[in-house]
Amino acid sequence: MANYDFKTIEKKWQDRWEKEGTFRAIDDFSLPKFYGLIEFPYPSGAGMHVGHIKAYSGMEVICRKRRMQGYNVLFPIDFDAFGLPAENYAIKTGTHPRIVTDQNIHNFTGQLKRVGFAFDWSRVVDTTDTDYYKWTQWIFLKMFEHGLVFRDKAFVNYCPSCKCVLSNEDSQGGKCDICHSDVIQKSKDVWFLRITEYADKLLDGLKHVDFPANIKAQQENWIGRSTGAFVNFTLSETDETLRIYTTRPDTLFGVTFMVMAPEHPLIDKYADRISNMDEVEKYRIECGKKTEFERTQLVKDKTGVKLSGLTAVNPVNGKEIPIFISDYVMMGYGTGAIMAVPAHDQRDWDFAKAFGIDIIQVIKGGDIEKEAYTGDGEMINSDFLNGTDNKKESIEKMLEFLKERGIGEKGVQYKMKDWAFNRQRYWGEPIPIIHCPHCGMVAVPENELPLKLPDVENFEPGEGGESPLAKIASFVNCTCPKCGAPAKRETDTMPQWAGSSWYFLRYIDPHNDKCFADKDKLKYWLPVDWYNGGMEHVTRHLIYSRFWHRFLYDIGEVPVPEPYAKRSGLGLVLGADGVKMSKSRGNVVDPDDVIKKYGADTLRTYIMFMSDYSASAPWKESGVKGCKRFLERVASLSDIAEGTGTTKKLESIMNKTVKKVSQDIEDMKFNTAIAAMMTCLNEINDVGTLTKDELSVFIRLLCPFAPHLCEEMWEQLGEEGLCSTAKWPDYDESKCVDDEIEIAVQVNGRVRDRFTVPADIEAADAIARAKELDKVKEFTDGMAFIKELYVPGKLVNLVVKPQ
């Protein structure tokens, strides 16, 4: 190719792919299928940066290869467009989120198409489209019908800036995941999804999917299943029970105090018995100003207040013990109260030291004057457990003791909490519930879905955190579908995670208005064969979507229990300064700028070549230029290709390259796949020629990475059809074996020389040749050979000593 005009070439092939529908999946159930999935983008006003390109390029390469291998490939794209950023922009500018969202989607679509992604654009969906969120609401109502949706007053994570409730997942580190403001605790009426009822199913499902170990571990840790015991402590001189959960019931004899969450309802119930209630109330007010993150930090001063006049009784020994309140105990975790064993829990030990509370050791080991002993050992000071030195046995004995006396039982707890599922904002799916003074909470009838967002002029939430929808009387006021009485609509909306919890199902049948997807199509396409996405979503979106899917499986709406057969991750593209790209740092690289200067194929190739796909790496302009030169050299191969068949000198390298690129793509080792093609190109240039058949092979290998150039070269070769749908090259394993290999020679453990031998050389011959090497003789002349060993393909090992 005399002139590699990437601008003309790339537009030409993008237009042809679109015109011919090259990448459309077809619902032909007789074909082998491959469903490749990426995390769909949130269409922000800033547009995409090159990090987005990397996020989509890994699965892009895999899907292009699968298509060339004869699979019916579904590789779709969507836009996760509900959420606070668009609404905050609307509040600031007065521009409706619908207008902003449509503009941003148009911008993102253009960027994606200019890169040349092989998406099936006929299946694009948008979570803000009523045809889509109708089914989001339908799934919500199915959960409501099956008791997985409930409303409760609770202390929740609340962002004063966004004026909305946040889930634990959206407020990690005590910061709002949306605006990064500090989160506070606030008592509000909250919609919850009972995700905890699916905790065991979510854990069990991990055994049946191909997820990396670190992703499985993060999900397991987030769910946080523990086994232990529920134990009932009575409040002195009352019939009241203070119920706690512990993973170490064997240490009950070491309990010397209890701690309740400042919000615990028993405090108010027995306020008349608590003589220092003023001090308690003051402390409770201070706790209310702290985030959950601040309250649960391990490394902080221990604060609290003793409840004077209120004590508990240790059920295993009858001892009266004090009760404190402290910020590190949360009402939403466990039972809102804990038993404290300061001898064997460091946080309890710190608290006991701060408040002068007794410390009773019940497990031998350590020096409890200096710190808590958290290891195993022989039980002491524990009545019937004394002398037992097996933790499991001690726990079983105590569980039996508790059960016999009716003061406790074996139990299971989870760190994961039920999912706070509402926002007091406008730009989200309306929650399809009606509040009737007679019937209570009533579902919007299915035939009235979608419940559409009304037009509003003011997007500001109310000062008390009410949704903007609460201001619209025509939306709020309605009739109860059960009894016909005047009623009120729910005015909260769903969180952004709602639409992304099932989008992979809608891709399968995006235009169906009778159901979210046809059962036969679901049976054919599910599960997703390979899902690639960011590591930041493995404890939020990935858990949420698995939960929704498993629920749909349980009610017979989908054919498989797990949505994703395989999941993989990727590293970030950092700025040239080595820091994560962000607009505020000014280190964002716009893919459009790279495409204008170097071309989409260069961008695609560099993104895949810059580092191991799973690693984060800085953007380097020099690397981009290097990939541009590589593609220019590839383009020039057209000028030297002639004839058919194989070139003897290239036979080995061509087969090796096909083998390596094929395997590296499967392993997501895209950088080494490209490196192998670069090595092959160097050998071709050293030989000075190649056949058209060999060029055809090379082009097909490169096509998933640089498809525009490869399509142009394919056409110039006179090949039929498109390179993107041509057959993936095969290789001959026998041709992948080197005729000659280089091996090392060690003398007394140190490498003294290297030499080339036939790959199939016999051991005796290899050893004999090694002994004749001049550099080896320097260390063996006059010496006695004690050991002679040939490790095939690697080395000759000689051990000598003076004669």
Task: Write out the residue ranges for each language-model feature.
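Conserved oxyanion/phosphate-binding beta-strand-loop segments in alpha/beta enzyme cores
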Residues: M1-L37, R67-P76, V100-N107, Y283-I325, ...
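NTP-handling and nucleic-acid-processing catalytic cores
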Residues: A2-Q14, V50, T136-K364, E466-P468, ...
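Long, charged, mostly alpha-helical binding arms that flank functional sites
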Residues: Y4, R225-F230, K364-D367, A372-E400, ...
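Residue patterns forming the tRNA-binding/recognition surfaces of aminoacyl-tRNA synthetases
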Residues: K12, R16-E20, K92-L242, T247-P249, ...
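N-terminal catalytic cores of NTP/NDP-binding nucleotidyl/phosphoryl-transfer enzymes
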Residues: I26-P97, V124-I139, T246-T247, N314-F351, ...
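Secondary-structure transition/capping motifs at alpha-helix termini
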Residues: R64-N72, K92-R98, R114-A118, E145-R151, ...
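Helix-rich, typically C-terminal accessory recognition domains appended to large enzymatic cores
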Residues: D80, E145-N157, S161, T251, ...
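Long, His/Glu/Asp-enriched segments that create or flank divalent metal/ion-associated functional microenvironments
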Residues: A443-C480, A485-R489, P495, A744-N748
